[in-house]
Amino acid sequence: MAVDTTTVAVALAVVLPVSIAVLIALVFWCKTQRRFKREEQDDEKNRGYDDEVVTFREMRASSGTLGPDGTPPTACAEGSGSSEGSESEKDPSPTPAPAGRAARTYMPAYRRRLNRSLSRQQSRADEMTTNSSAASYDTQHAQNAQLSVFEQMVPVLQVDNSSPFANPRDAAFERGSRHSSESLMKSLKNQDFGSYPKRRPSAANTANLAVYNGSVSSFSSRVPSSTTLNCMGDESFYAYEGSVLPRTGRDLPEVKQDVYMLKNNYDVTNNEEITEEDQYENEFTNYSENKREFIDSLRPKAERMSN
């Protein structure tokens, strides 16, 4: 019986990669299951210790700073204890959990590490409290508040309102940072970035203003206007000779100043005449010349030739 080479080639091309992929997936699955079992064993070992620590903290929080007989703890009454005395009063060893009880909830690795770090910090705080004196026991117990189970599972943020779990140093730092940010915002609001200074009246404008105020009625008999009173404090109001007018009893005639002013490329005094000067005109934008050329282009060719 002859073997078909095409069938063998197709079988090898399909079956061989699939077999290798399945084998690799099985290897990874076995490693993952082994890792889960190891984590479950660690959880079983630490669960008893966590339960004991939480129970002990709740008992201490409920009993307060005094003992069951209304007396302070032994280590606090004796003063600062030695290292041997503190070692004897450490938390009891965790009781092993029953082997038949399986973990119902999965806890990720970062949460376990966080719980371990919190338990270590709390144990250090307990040792410091145990070795402290009886006078400072109450203040340290108030500052180093015990962490509850809710705080271990859900992070609690600091707020302005005082709470039993708030750290005084963190609250003071937060108030200082808020005060510094508010002062920075106030200073930025008071500063004038990018604004132009107040325009002071020039000599010509001041003279025109004085002439207008004096031409309405007698300068000596009339009451000064609000504009004149407001400009009295300006340092440049009477700084020029042309702005000071003689005080006489007769009405002053209106003096017409020969001031050339442009408004929309037209002379103010003569609206019919188009001025050749343009304040926005340069060698690249010659509006007058371009307009003249455009008007000439609209005329008939014979008329342009005659001109």
UniProtKB/Swiss-Prot annotation:
Extracellular side: 1-7
Subcellular location: Cell membrane; Bud membrane
Membrane-traversing stretches: 8-28
Region (Disordered): 61-137
Highest taxon of the lineage: Eukaryota
Membrane topology per record: Single-pass type III membrane protein
One BP annotation, GO: cell wall organization
Cytoplasmic topology ranges: 29-307
GO cellular component: cellular bud membrane
Biased composition (Polar residues): 128-137
Keyword Cell division among record annotations: no
Keywords: Cell membrane, Cell wall biogenesis/degradation, Membrane, Signal-anchor, Transmembrane, Transmembrane helix
Its biological purpose: Plays a role in cell wall integrity. Affects the cell wall polymer composition in the growing region of the cell.
Family membership: Belongs to the SKG1 family.
Protein name as it appears in the record: Suppressor of lethality of KEX2 GAS1 double null mutant protein 1
